[in-house]
Amino acid sequence: MVIAIDGPAASGKGTLARRLAAYYGLPHLDTGLLYRAVGAIVLAQGQLQDEAASVEAARTLDVATLDPEALRTAELGEAASVVAARGGVRAALLDLQHRFAAQPGGAVLDGRDIGTVICPKAQAKLFVTASPEVRAERRHRELIGRGEDVAYETVLADIRKRDERDSARAAAPLVQADDAVLLDTSALDIAQAFAAALAIVEARRAGR
């Protein structure tokens, strides 16, 4: 079984993906980390605006070296949004994601284009969202908890900028797949959101 979870930044899709993967005993890939890793590489090289450098970084990326905690900074979130808008970067990471999804038994993937581009035939598709304000509150708490000194207003502006860039890009824009189920987590806590997501997946498994 392949479960595809898409949605904007800080919508809760990653948390739900990890919990669903643990529940079903499936491997999980946060595809956003791939773009954050590419962003980290070109930032370190001083080449964030160099498309060729970002494509090369994506082409040679080793998933085994990813450090999720180190990649979850506000700066790398912004860098990820920049490099993810480049068709060459997305193409370079496509095969890696396809191979992950094709594992025996299935997988859970979350990102921006899983249900539309990476796994269009996934058995269960969710589009997880929440209001920009709620998402900014969540991301702000996360960043403060990690020791980053950042204002809520800055995080909200960043969320809105990333939403616009993700939705407007030419390469695999953020859109809800026609057969994805919308899950708005604005008023839900983690337990409620997981219960709703699990119900959606179980309904799809039962053919409903």
Curated annotation (Swiss-Prot):
It is found in: Cytoplasm. Its main location: cytoplasm. GO terms for biological process: pyrimidine nucleotide metabolic process. ATP binds at G7, P8, A9, A10, S11, G12, K13, G14, T15. GO terms for molecular function: ATP binding; CMP kinase activity; dCMP kinase activity. CDD domains: CMPK. It is an enzyme of class 2 (transferase). Keywords: ATP-binding, Cytoplasm, Kinase, Nucleotide-binding, Transferase. NCBIfam families: cmk. Belongs to the cytidylate kinase family. Type 1 subfamily. This is Cytidylate kinase. The lineage of its organism: Bacteria, Pseudomonadati, Pseudomonadota, Alphaproteobacteria, Hyphomicrobiales.
